[in-house]
Amino acid sequence: MTTEYETIDTAIPALGEARIPSPLRKEKKQGERFFVSDEKKVLIDSDADRIVEIIRAGKEPSAFEMAGPREMIYFDPSKLRCALVTCGGLCPGLNGIIRAVVLELYYGYGVRNIYGIRYGLQGFIPAYRHNVVDLTPNIVGDIIRKGGSFLGSSRGPQDVNEIVDSLERMNIGMLFMVGGDGTLMAATKIADAILERNLKISVVGIPKTIDNDIYMVSRSFGFDTAVDVSTQSIRAAHNEARGYPNGIGLIKLMGRHSGFIAATAALAQQDVNFVLIPEVDFDMDGHGGFLATLERRLADRGHAVIVVAEGAGQKFFEETGKRDASGNIRLHDIGAFLKDAISKYFSEKKMEISLKLIDPSYNIRSLPANSNDHVFCSFLGRNAVHAAMAGKTKVLVGHWNNQFVHVPMTASAGRRKQVNPYGRLWQSILEATGQGSLRNG
């Protein structure tokens, strides 16, 4: 049986042969053990039975290149000019990525011309008149203490040819793009346009999504911080719910199409009785539906805590077709919908409740990263630099099977990772909450 992993092309494009000895070689005493060969791979599928089956069939298991410094590099650091841009919504850890990239370029490779592009892809377009920032270790030294993005950001597409024109004018040899799925698709188009012009510009993506929904990336930066802070909101909601007869704490968390934050935070703070996510359908009415199940929970225990991802339950709304600046379909407010539906249901039952709705979304997005995410961002940023210095392009640096790897942009862009309703994470939620299917029949 062919798995989805076997069809993934894991080859990483390169601008040319890497012939320059890495300056890291002079600094490190570990010798060759410090460097990573392109032949060093990380298996995509870690299931031993499937690996044996693939090998017996005479095939080679699919694997990603392992990330890390190469002994030979493509670019001459003394003549190199680099650009870095952050795009899309805010996320804890953006400043950590910026800092890690700058420090590795400056101290690791001796690059002195590093430019920060202001306000996302707008910064490349002359009509917006955004200034470029010279990035040095002094400039980025303490930015990890702050939330948001030191360079600013923006949403929405910009003309690819204008972006490449700007890169040519600035004589950029290396572009680091930090962003989510839309940014990675834009990065793919930019890399293609660069190749069509026969330019020697490396494009390296660093995946950013607080929802942790980038395909072929097991963990994205900011997710750990989001879960950490979300558990505080769950704790607050639990205290509110227990403080009143028939108390209900309702927490709306981020997750447009993927419920990883809601599910993981619920498991981290196991006071949650219901978890509603986009990947798992549920009914509102009927004996097996959410409202009747909530009523039974209150009758049994006197309080309840509900966690809902922002993209859950969209079937209960009429489609408007409206989209935001990034092209995403505008979601209806499931938090307000549930609050109204719960209040109406128990009012008709003449059952008094105390309902509190908590939405920490924007607080979470704009916070500084926690310590775990800071470490993760450092690895991502430095490995992105190593990949670019080796002349690799149209690549993103990701985390897979507990290793940092090179993922082709074409393998990830335009696809989404979601919670598997039959997987271990969701089964753990069902065990922890006891909520059942919340479906009739």
Can you annotate each of these PLM segments?
Residues 77-85, 123, 141-151, 208-218, ...:
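Gly-rich Lys/Arg/Thr-decorated short loops/hinges at beta-loop-alpha junctions or inter-strand turns
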Residues 81-91, 149-152, 173-179, 205, ...:
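Short glycine-rich or small-residue beta-strand-to-loop segments that form or flank ligand, phosphate
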Residues 1-26, 75-125:
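N-terminal phosphate-binding or glycine-rich loops at protein starts, especially the Walker A/P-loop
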Residues 166, 177-179, 184-200, 204, ...:
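Accessory alpha-helical/coil subdomains and C-terminal extensions
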Residues 1-33, 322-441:
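C-terminal non-catalytic interaction/assembly regions of soluble proteins
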Residues 39-75, 123-173, 184, 219-228, ...:
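Glycine-rich oxoanion-binding loops at beta->alpha junctions
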Residues 87-89, 117-122, 155-156, 180-181, ...:
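Short, ordered loop/turn segments at secondary-structure junctions
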Residues 91-101, 124-125, 158-163, 181-189, ...:
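Short glycine/serine/threonine-rich phosphate/pyrophosphate-binding segments
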